[in-house]
């Protein structure tokens, strides 16, 4: 559009400064800090191990912790983080991994419906409203549908769906192969000891940002809260600068920003 002269360069790149785009960028960094510090993995391990080795309680714990984590962070990252832990527990309990991994994947998908940044389609429809000059969805407005939907999915899976989950029996699994698969899916693969202090810091930052968004403070817009949290993640050492940049889903950022520019062009030309 800029090359063809439909829009001046200022308008072509204006979408990158849109408040919703900035909000996404900030939350991506905060989510990355959860995984890098090991907080997400620690939460997952604690909850899943607390459930024991009985198939149904284990399935319930897996789905609940996955829904919570995927609502404020990457669905793929959540699955990659929990997958090796779940496979290890399944092996120890003599449970088919497929019986727990399918609920893990389903929970990650449904958990993303709870917040505006939970899954790319939420981003796209929010972008469409913004591009049309209409009020956009609030950060938690998806939760009115997402939370009841999540509850229904969990209950259905526990009482009915689990009977239809394929029972893929497997022999001894190669731990290195499992780790490699998790890393390919998005896990950090960093086996270095994690700092509990940084875990606490990243958790407090996340809770603080989410609380500000839930309260809807007039003097602290959503995007300002998200960026402040992202900066704190770097300043406190939870993430290095390069890790913060790597944690941002740039495809989603440019998709959203690009839609705004296209909408501006259509409005200007009357298309």
Regions found by a protein language model. Give the residues of each.
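Hydrophobic alpha-helical membrane segments of integral membrane proteins
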Residues: 1, 75-82, 102-103, 114-118, ...
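Hydrophobic transmembrane alpha-helices of multi-pass small-molecule transporters
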Residues: 1-23, 29, 142-269
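Residue-level recognition of transmembrane alpha-helices
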Residues: 25, 63, 84, 104-105, ...
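Juxtamembrane and boundary regions of transmembrane helices in multi-pass small-molecule transporters
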Residues: 93-106, 111-185
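Membrane-embedded alpha-helical core segments of multi-pass
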Residues: 4, 25-26, 64-65, 81-82, ...
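Membrane-embedded alpha-helical segments and adjacent helix-loop junctions characteristic
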Residues: 6-96, 247-271
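Short polybasic/polar patches that bind polyanions
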Residues: 2, 35, 91, 115, ...
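Transmembrane alpha-helix interface/packing and boundary motifs in multi-pass membrane proteins
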Residues: 65-74, 106-117, 211-218
């Amino acid at each position: 559009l800029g090359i063809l002269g439909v829009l001046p360069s200022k308008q072509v790149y204006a979408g990158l400064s849109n408040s919703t785009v900035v909000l996404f960028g900030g939350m991506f960094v905060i989510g990355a800090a959860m995984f890098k510090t090991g907080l997400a993995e620690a939460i997952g391990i604690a909850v899943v191990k607390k459930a024991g080795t009985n198939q149904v309680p284990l399935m319930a714990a897996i789905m609940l912790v996955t829904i919570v984590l995927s609502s404020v962070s990457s669905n793929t990252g959540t699955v990659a983080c929990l997958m090796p832990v779940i496979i290890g527990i399944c092996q120890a309990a003599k449970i088919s991994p497929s019986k727990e991994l399918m609920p893990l994947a389903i929970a990650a998908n449904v958990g993303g419906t709870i917040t505006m940044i939970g899954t790319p389609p939420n981003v796209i429809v929010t972008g469409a409203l913004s591009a049309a000059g209409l009020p956009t969805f609030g950060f938690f407005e998806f939760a009115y549908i997402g939370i009841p939907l999540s509850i229904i999915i969990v209950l259905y899976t526990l009482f009915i769906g689990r009977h239809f989950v394929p029972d893929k029996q497997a022999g001894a699994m190669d731990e290195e192969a499992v780790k490699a698969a998790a890393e390919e899916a998005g896990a950090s693969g960093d086996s270095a000891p994690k700092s509990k202090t940084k875990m606490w810091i990243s958790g407090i930052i996340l809770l603080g940002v989410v609380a500000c968004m839930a309260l809807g403070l007039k003097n602290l817009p959503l995007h300002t809260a998200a960026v402040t949290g992202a900066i704190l993640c770097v300043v406190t050492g939870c993430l290095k600068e390069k890790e913060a940049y790597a944690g941002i889903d740039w495809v989603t950022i440019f998709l959203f920003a690009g839609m705004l520019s296209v909408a501006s062009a259509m409005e200007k030309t009357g298309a």
